[in-house]
């Protein structure tokens, strides 16, 4: 995990320091683009694997931990909570030898959020994310109901982008607790306008391995 932390820090620092230069414009601060080619079912190993037994060291040792921290910072905690907690971890454990559990506890206490579900999926398993928009229907009051499913084994918060017939766009963020009762969730829109299109993870920032079910569009 140490090298993954270094990768996370180095990528972001380099992207900011060299911003606006030919080199800076080529830096992929988010290693999400590598996920599809390094997460083959039955081949990927968890981050907690013994380093001497790791087959794909570049992914397990460097890029996946960086992607994990990227996701935690921007999509789970937000930079306003992640950054102070991460700095606190660095100050607290500088020149010492923390274990993964030490990092987990400090991030929980400093951020104020229980993160066991996150560490389980990212570190102890090779869980995969597959969020989907199953369908959209209209209830008796004229409001649209959006039916979502989590078809993978990883859970993460969800972001929806709803496009209405009049061209207006609404963005909705749903917390990870939406999956507490199972892999299906329905969300009732506050607007009664006719829905043209619903997309989950519209910014493509989550490691969703199947994009084909991320979009629902009303048929003409």
Question: Where do the PLM segments sit?
Answer:
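Short, solvent-exposed mixed-charge patches
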Residues: 219-220
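Intrinsically disordered, low-complexity regions enriched in Ser/Pro/Gly/Gln/His and often acidic
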Residues: 111-115, 172, 209
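Beta-strand-rich binding/interaction modules
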Residues: 82, 116, 129-132, 136-202
